[in-house]
Curated annotation (Swiss-Prot):
Gene Ontology biological process terms, A to Z: 3,4-dihydroxybenzoate biosynthetic process; amino acid biosynthetic process; aromatic amino acid family biosynthetic process; chorismate biosynthetic process
EC number: 4.2.1.10
The species this protein was found in: Salmonella paratyphi A (strain ATCC 9150 / SARB42)
UniProt keyword Lyase present: yes
Pathway in which the depicted protein is active: Metabolic intermediate biosynthesis; chorismate biosynthesis; chorismate from D-erythrose 4-phosphate and phosphoenolpyruvate: step 3/7
SUPFAM superfamilies documented for this protein: Aldolase (SSF51569)
Gene that specifies this protein: aroD
Residue sites binding 3-dehydroquinate per the record: 21, 46-48, 82, 213, 232, 236
Name assigned to this protein: 3-dehydroquinate dehydratase
TM regions (residue ranges): none
Record key words, sorted: Amino-acid biosynthesis, Aromatic amino acid biosynthesis, Lyase, Schiff base
Top EC class for this record: lyase
């Protein structure tokens, strides 16, 4: 399987990489969080731009990105505006969403962008091509905060992300039962064994799905999200606890 290397971090081999989310609402809280996060041990920093209030100003967004980059120059930075329809904090037009991502790509400050699969195939493909032309990787994502689709449907979505050029396909779903968690793990394993030619990230959310955040190395998920202070999605656990369990499973 092809790995993805970002700032000397090899995603897709060994232990799942730990991603943490920074969710400051203004420039001061972004800076404070970024400085505080330097004390934590993790692999990738996701900036959840949908928590930032001044998204109407691209300049403000880029200023905040610069603050984060200056605070942590060596950590891979993932730029994520999560849409309201997929569990994010704000509603913006597709055009604004795409222009924010392009501005982030142009800035040279981010290593990866998160691009939602259901933004529209033509726009997704154009943005992937634009990112790759600027040496920025694409995590292509889909989130369902209400249910868990069938394993077949989840595999189809992940395969579509590959077909559209995602460097790392990602899916996160909400379980309504323990069986749903098994469905997500089944889809992950099937993808890894039969279709994936690049790293994939999957998770089942909430308390019920916590096992999926820990068992990535077993079933084929290349990264997992942990919390430094505040969780960005239900079911995330503290980064130190997360790393301990990942290491136990890795060394077993």
């Amino acid at each position: 399987m092809k790995t993805v290397t970002v700032k000397n971090l090899i995603i897709g081999e060994g232990m799942p990489k730990i991603i943490v989310s920074l969710m400051g609402r203004d420039i001061n809280s972004v800076k404070a969080e970024a400085l505080a996060y330097r004390e934590a041990t993790f692999d990738i920093l996701e900036w959840r731009v949908d928590h930032f209030m001044d998204i109407a100003s691209t300049q403000s967004v880029l200023t905040a990105a610069r603050v984060i980059r200056d605070a942590m120059p060596d950590i891979p930075l993932l730029f994520t505006f999560r849409s309201a329809k997929e569990g994010g904090e704000q509603t913006i037009t597709t055009q604004h969403y795409l222009s924010l991502n392009r501005a982030a790509i142009d800035s040279g400050l981010v290593d990866m962008i998160d691009l939602e699969l259901f933004t529209g195939d033509a726009d997704v493909k154009a943005t992937v091509d634009y990112a790759h032309a600027h040496n920025v990787y694409v995590v292509m994502s889909n989130h369902d905060f209400h249910q868990t689709p069938s394993a077949e449907e989840m595999v189809l979505r992940l395969r579509k992300m590959q077909a559209l050029g995602a460097d790392i396909p990602k899916i996160a779903v909400m379980p309504q039962s323990k069986h749903d968690v098994l469905t997500l793990l089944t889809a992950t394993l099937e993808m890894q064994q039969h279709y994936a030619d690049r790293p994939v990230i999957t998770m089942s959310m909430a308390k019920e799905g916590v096992i999926s955040r820990l068992a990535g190395e077993v079933f084929g998920s290349a990264a997992t999200f942990g919390a430094v202070k505040q969780a960005s999605a239900p079911g995330q656990i503290a980064v130190n606890d997360l790393r301990s369990v990942l290491m136990i499973l890795h060394n077993a």
